[in-house]
Amino acid sequence: MSAKIVVEVAYALPEKQYLQRVTLQEGATVEEAIRASGLLELRTDIDLAKNKVGIYSRPTKLADVVHDGDRVEIYRPLIADPKELRRQRAEKSANK
């Protein structure tokens, strides 16, 4: 019989944070943890084909195996490109 592990799945919005604790079979993947959390049903804006995921702020793939105590994070897409914002600020400063 395979051992059980407990992981947390997190998704944060500016106004609300979701943190679900799930129990899985040892050897479960990031995707299985996310699906078991129920967040895909709660938040229709999460698309695993588009949203990046990670474990403790380190980018990972949906097929990667989770370990007991991991925190799986679902990241929202960037609203603005940081490089573009820096370029715009630099241009604005140069024009002063």
Curated annotation (Swiss-Prot):
SUPFAM superfamilies: MoaD/ThiS (SSF54285). InterPro entries: Mopterin_synth/thiamin_S_b (IPR016155), RnfH (IPR005346), RnfH_sf (IPR037021). Coiled coil: none annotated. NCBIfam families: PRK01777.1 (NF002490). Belongs to the UPF0125 (RnfH) family. HAMAP family: UPF0125_RnfH. This is Protein RnfH. The gene is rnfH.
